[in-house]
Amino acid sequence: MGMRPPAGLPSLSKRSRVLLVLALVVAALLLVGPRLISTYTDWLWFGEVGFRGVFTTVLVTRLLLFLVVGVVVGGIVWLALLLAYRSRPVFVPVSGPNDPVARYRTTVMTRLRLFGLAIPIAVGLLAGLIAQSSWVTVQLFVNGGSFGVADPEFGLDVGFYTFDLPFYRFVLNWLFVAVLLAFFASLVTHYIFGGLKLAGRGGALTNAARVQLAVLAGTFILLKAVAYWFDRYSLLSSSRKEPTFTGGSYTDMNAVLQAKLILLAIAVICAGAFFAAIFLRDLRIPAMATALLVLSSILVGAVWPLVVEQFSVRPNAADKESAYIERNIAATRQAYGITDDKVEYQDYQGYGTTPPRDVPADVTTIANTRLLDPNILSRTFTQQQQLKNFYGFPPTLDIDRYDIDGEMRDYIVAARELSSKSLTGNQTDWINKHTVYTHGNGLVAAPANRVNAAAGESAEEAANSNSGYPVYMVSDIASQAAGDQVIPVEQPRIYYGEVIADTDADYAIVGGSEGSDPREYDTDTSRYTYTGSGGVPIGNWFNRLAFAAKYTERNILFSGAIGSDSKIIYNRDPRDRVTHVAPWLTADGDSYPAVVDGKVVWIVDAYTTLQDYPYAQRSSLDGLVEDSIDQNTGRLLPRKEVSYIRNSVKATVDAYDGTVKLYQVDQNDPVLDAWMGVFPDAVQPADSIPDELRAHFRYPEDLFKVQREMLAKYHVDDPKEFFTNNAFWSVPSDPTIDTSANQPPYYVLVGDPETGKPSFNLTSAMVGYSREFLSAYLSVKSDPENYGKFTVLQLPTDTQTQGPQQTQNSMISDPRVASERTLLERSNKIQYGNLLTLPIANGGILYVEPMYTERSSTGPNTSTFPQLSRVLVSYREPPPSNSVRVGYAPTLAQALDQVFGAGTGSVATAPSAEEGTPPETGTTPPVEQGAAPPAPTAPATPPSGTDVSAAVAELDASLDALTAAQRSGDFAAYGAALARVQKAVAAYEAIPK
């Protein structure tokens, strides 16, 4: 007697179906709605900045990728399901009423179209969503060109590896996915409809199931054969020998390469075996072929290269890898822009032969020696130039140069920006935060080589005088009205900047109805209405609704402060604006303000990068650029593996209207050429750069830090010496902090050795590999006529010239420094500024370091900030002495005279006054609307009384004795004198204050 087929899965009630549909609609709105709103507001924003072509190109490319990959992958899966269903057996026996396969089969049959279409559509949608993110790969393939450089193994142009190969991999990967999904979809379908049975010892397949699965399996293995072919080219970016070098090694080129060809042939045979199963019912042939491929992959693809590496290469690594290291050296220099035509190497002895005052370049260098450290003085700028509590400066200031009265000088510069995080009390009300406090006020600059007055001679005078502060030149609304701007600025209002954008919702709403009163805070006596071209109009209700949803802020809808002419300003960080309009660029970690043609603009360096330049060293971008400054500010490049980098674009962002301009500065970058093909109107040609703007271009810090890491190894020409690491350099650790972070490079204005004129350079000291002695000095020019020219001064391998850490130790352990530091630390915090390394005296190295003091805080509202108190100088004397002389004085001139003798210091830039005066009270910036103003700092009370006088006298006497013993060379006397100093210091500290 026949058996009834089992019932299908229970169906939902009508009410449940309605609720399910509603839930799906709500979920779709929650998922898709924010994306649609974001797309619309982005479309408006790109139109505001004039880069809507970038937005539409990227959007269309993503949509096309979504459609093509989605249709191909979904279509292949749909076709597999269709063929499997149509070739199902006519009669499928049921094992019983509880047969689970029969229940699923019944369910599928009752909803055949749903399953037949929903599964391919879902797979296609998911595949399209994933694939659309690869729009960069597709566009570079379409628009990429030639590098004009052939790889040393296959003789193919580098463009094949950077533009073509990633696209071929992209296509191949999605074909793998499509065929694999189709195989499993067919397998499941045949199983449900009886084409595949698992009962019995070996199971059973219908002819149709066998043919379909064999074709799909054979196609998959055939694609694997194609992948083996492309794997050969990927060997040129092999990581087998990292971190020693990147690229094909001896094992890769002599074992793995041949293994790939062998596996390719075996894969073709294996694919043929599966295709043969179409006609042969015996599945043992494809099974044996598969086993052969798996076994070959293990033995030929893994074991054989391992044997070659262990028994042939390792015992003779230096000789075996020599040719491949040579390839790596050449490719890395090319990829990172450190080829011999860009880098000039000079031998440098490490000790001077000519007095600095007799060398014109040294006179210029000393006169422009930077004493102000932009990494320390942010709080000093804030306390002295903040004006209002809602203004602020970035934690790290910037350095730029200006030609004033025919003389080039470097300046510490910062825009006085709006700091939303500093708003207090009623200032944080939505109306005030977003419609009243909308912009900053002006640019503040200070000459980097001078202060307002020299600190006093004694420790007490140094720490308690109104000296050692920057000499400010302010270009703001007030100075504009008074007509006394040294750096003329026509529009000092800052609507776009780093500090302004340092909050989650960084938008401002400007403008209003026609004829409405100004609302934005400008000065204490005036209000302002924005007149610039920046901002997206929100006068119509649809845009207001879109932005209210974007920021989840109902006030945008209902506020009466928004009128028909209102605009919303957002994306106010200069770096973010650049990366938005040029998503194919990597922005430098630091943007800096400059005055160009009377306007404050932010200059942003931008890089083109590649991940797989054949044989070039691959490295982590964020790891290469991290130093002591970046650790404090968090100003790092993205986590990104690169093997090619160029600073091909300089971008500017107008601080008032947000206008973004991209300028081509490298006309020999094939990557930029490709992107200019993708976005023809995005980047302006190099000849359109105004001369005044070009004069403010700096060689970017992040690129320099990447290149110095490369030069630390890749200055070596001999591959065998490269393999031993003997001639490598290291970036010194920053001696002014307690951690082992790298010392940052420094911008300095130095004398050109040929002309003696000031040259704006970015510099870095380099020490020996795992050593502390100075090994090299790197500098790169930022001057327009010599921009990007590297000079590397190489010291002898047996040099005794101290490196930065040794110099710091010798300076702070000098008896004069140690004794005064003990006195100062009782009521002050000491900070050492940038330790500058300056080549002078035709072969010598001069170290200059400012020392800042900051009075210890005595209360929660006490305002303290750093001031320059002392200048330290270190210089190694020439043979036979080779001794290191240390200068320590309130001024650079005095410190230089201590080291070189009277006269050298006369060329240093003098402070504005000789002695400081006691600090004035009541100079802290006002705080608005209920915030308590900081209390003025009470000066520290100096020690007094006969006990203190006696202790100081004994301390001075012990230091004199220590100096005399040091000069005599009597180690016994030196030890006794040192013990006396320690005893005197302990006695002084024991006096109750």
UniProtKB/Swiss-Prot annotation:
Membrane topology: Multi-pass membrane protein
Domain of life, per lineage: Bacteria
Biased composition (Low complexity): 908-926
Principal subcellular localization: membrane
Transmembrane residue ranges: 18-38, 63-83, 114-134, 174-194, 211-231, 260-280, 288-308
Annotated keywords: Cell membrane, Membrane, Transmembrane, Transmembrane helix
Region described as Disordered: spans on this chain: 904-948
Chain intervals with Pro residues compositional bias: 933-942
Regions annotated as coiled coil: none
GO CC terms, sorted: extracellular region; plasma membrane
Pfam family, one: UPF0182
Location of this chain's protein in the cell: Cell membrane
Family: Belongs to the UPF0182 family.
Name of protein: UPF0182 protein ROP_64500
Annotated organism of origin: Rhodococcus opacus (strain B4)
